[in-house]
UniProtKB/Swiss-Prot annotation, chains A, B:
Record-linked InterPro entries: FA_synthesis, Phospholipid_synth_PlsX-like
Membership in a protein family: Belongs to the PlsX family.
Keyword set includes Cytoplasm: yes
Main localisation: cytoplasm
HAMAP family for this protein: PlsX
One annotated GO molecular function: phosphate:acyl-[acyl carrier protein] acyltransferase activity
Pathway terms, separated by semicolons: Lipid metabolism; phospholipid metabolism
Pfam families: FA_synthesis (PF02504)
Official protein name in the record: Phosphate acyltransferase
Biological process (GO), any one: phospholipid biosynthetic process
Reaction(s) catalysed by this chain's protein: a fatty acyl-[ACP] + phosphate = an acyl phosphate + holo-[ACP]
Subunit structure: Homodimer. Probably interacts with PlsY.
Keyword Lipid biosynthesis in record: yes
Gene label: plsX
Length: 348, 348
């Protein structure tokens, strides 16, 4: 298999990207890598060219660039060229640590939507602290700020495929992030989405979940509209970071006694931090497009990049995209029926 | 001043409510309390009737009751009777630890909206860990699942009044919870709200805030639509609780060494937990109605109830409601102009 790598995206690109790719090359012997990037910067960093090919590009999409504009105008950027390679069948998957919006645009407009998927969405695996499994799929993380009920329904399908194919969870359960457990809770979008999902033949819906229970692991897939999904994810990250910071500060403030305690607890803290640092395990995936497209956080170092290659390999090995495609192709009536039920409800 | 107390609402009602009121009575010598509740249950709990009056009621709104229905049907419930006392001028403020939705309905339909406020909303003070002040106002916590831009604009006004009058923050700053820092981020509602707020003569708008920075204290008031505000608040609470739980578990798992460390760090953990437990400091306030209406969490114990009386006293002492009322009365043109600008934008 071949992975097209945007070598220029990310805070520590191209250095950490190239280092990560070399680790992955040594780890997975069936992956070939195409590095898209500025030759003068990337070339000196590669120590061993085995299964690594450099495709020189002349432009870079910056973190601050306006996504759609950047994708349209920077035609010789590392990201756009890597996306086009996937589109044209020269590579099987796309990886970037760069501008998320531009990667989304590249995924949707260049790699292309799977026919029948209305809105590709961003998904990630988060730690599930008390559930049956170690992780759950959370989506949409913010690809679509304005989600409709039919989109949320489709996220249930896409998320279930990711949970089964990549996290290895048999018949995954699905919940809808809402501001109450009862089915009449939420705004119109979530009320209607709940009704659609309740009768879903395509996945195993358990009902609503409130953001307070997110990390408890009461479902294998949690579906959210992109706006509140983004808010819940970021509030979770922000709170976890703030607490670790506060604990460190409290330890430093508490004199010899506290510092001794802190030293003794170091291994315990490390294990929690590791569990929380879900970014190390891989990236956010754009589900609903014609190939695996994965984004790691901008500050990803080599290890995270290498781990993400493992995640992409699993997606390819498990035929995630073709299985989604086949499912949607053979269930157009169900998806259509969902939309009609929806329209009937809205016009009632 | 007189506070009407729903003595029957909350997981530990009426015991902890009555205990809390007695603590508050001893602490604040200018407050009279009216306890609305089932006589046979409340009467035996009161140890000293000084400045405490029992108004017997025969019904109780339960946590699981459908809010509007319960408010309409249970006319002799402790909550409805307490709300009516405020409406009729027999009391200055309303307190309950009961059904939040029913309290919202009672506040809006019985106590009544301030003329000119389109949507009363739920606000709370959260800890600000790195800001200039210790706390900031976060609203709407979920009173309105479907918020319009003009509502978010009004929350900016209401929140600023709460920050100045109750938290004592001079010329408070305001931010809008959105899924990106740039002004073109978010769905239509948040894009338009940002434009309205940017030109706000009524408050000091600093721009968007992402949920990740919520606890950092970069603003004195954070305005959110009720749906994502609810999600962000609950994700914050859930993550904080989960982390404390995980730390405890990691300490227990880490042998003698870890347990010793945990024992040494106990005071440090206590101080963080106290800072995080914003519920102890008071309740969530329904802003935009004609009197202070405050809800503490259902599991509130006596201390939290007593502290909430202090919060209500500040609201009354500082003339929060009449100052909001006066401001809105004298700025109808501005509020109207905001709506017109909005309509122009929407129809453009």
């Amino acid at each position: 298999m071949k992975i097209a790598v945007d070598a220029m995206g990310g805070d520590f690109a191209p250095l950490e990207i190239v280092k990560g790719i070399e680790i992955a090359r040594d780890r997975y012997d069936d992956i070939d890598f195409q590095l898209y990037g500025t030759a003068s910067e990337v070339k000196p960093l590669v120590t061993n060219w085995e299964r690594i090919e450099l495709i020189p590009t002349t432009e870079v999409i910056e973190m601050g660039d306006e996504p759609v504009k950047a994708m349209r105008r920077k035609k010789d950027s590392s990201m756009v060229r890597a996306a086009l390679a996937v589109k044209e069948g020269h590579a099987d998957a796309l990886f970037s640590a760069g501008n998320t919006g531009a990667l989304l645009s590249s995924a949707i407009f260049l790699v292309g939507r799977i026919k029948g998927v209305d809105r590709p969405a961003l998904a990630t695996a988060l730690p599930s602290f008390e559930g049956e499994h170690d992780q759950f799929v959370f989506m949409d993380l913010g690809a679509n700020a304005d989600s409709k009920p039919a989109h949320l329904y489709q996220y249930g399908i896409l998320g279930s495929f990711y949970a089964s194919h990549v996290l290895g969870i048999q018949s995954p359960t699905v919940r809808l992030l809402n501001n109450g457990a009862e089915e009449d809770k939420g705004d119109e979008v979530h009320k209607v989405a709940h009704q659609l999902m309740k009768n879903a033949p395509s996945f195993n819906f358990l009902g609503n979940i409130e953001a307070r229970e997110l990390l408890e692991g009461t479902a294998d897939v949690v579906v959210a509209d992109g706006f509140s999904g983004n808010a819940a994810l970021k509030a979770t990250e922000g709170t976890a970071l703030m607490m670790l910071k506060q604990i460190k500060a409290a330890i430093m403030d508490s004199g010899t006694r506290g510092k001794m305690g802190g030293a003794l607890l170091k291994p315990a803290f490390k294990s929690i931090q590791k569990k929380l640092d879900y970014n190390e395990a891989g990236g956010a995936v754009i589900l609903g497009v014609k190939a695996p497209v994965v984004k790691t956080h901008g500050s990803a170092k080599a290890t995270a990049v290498a781990n993400t290659m493992g995640q992409i390999k699993t997606m390819i090995d498990q035929h995630l995209v073709s299985d989604i495609q086949n499912y949607i192709d053979t269930h157009t009536e169900e998806l259509q029926a969902g939309k009609e039920a929806l329209n009937a409800q809205i016009n009632a």
